[in-house]
Amino acid sequence: MLKSMRTSIITIGIIIMILNLFGCSERTKQNNNKPSIQTPLTEQIIDTTSDDMLLEVVYDNLFRKLSPAYDKEYEIVLSWNKSRQAIYMISRLEAEVNNGGYNQFYFNSSGQFAAALPEALKLVGATKFADLTERANSTFEKEKSKITEAQDGTVEGFSKSYENNPLNKFDEEFYKLNDVENLQKIQVDYIRKNKKEFTD
């Protein structure tokens, strides 16, 4: 009885080790598909990174350049070439609008790039997104006091600022436009055609 129990435990242990080995192996393979953000970005990395990972790799590389001095984000980003500026700003816009709409974009530090974004979007070939963002910028400037009136620094105040917010219509338009003209694909195509602009 004791011998068969010991054999069962050993067998189970071996099975667990084999499963862990294969599980870890798969995780390692997945992580190897994405270059470390600690390495300089090279043409080879851009060429060998899949389309679904390229934007993240480039953004990570750009964000790493900010990390030590994030409080100077605006100045640092504007010191980059136009291509890097565009990808960084568009990624911020897309993340904010997809998470909480244009209202959240303007509320957070990403809003500091609002005026520069239409040109950045045009640069990468996203002209319809540029037009949409110009209209959202114009509405925000005209309706700023109404939009920000409830934003008192509390979660409740920010949540209340979505009620009857004139920016809400732009959120819906952004989502529908992105279904037709994928903004991430537009950026990936731009990066591939202009890869020297992104290498370190």
Each language-model region and where it sits:
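Bacterial signal peptide processing site
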Residues: 25-27
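Bacterial N-terminal signal peptides that target proteins for export
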Residues: 2-11
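A generic structural signal for short
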Residues: 2, 105-106
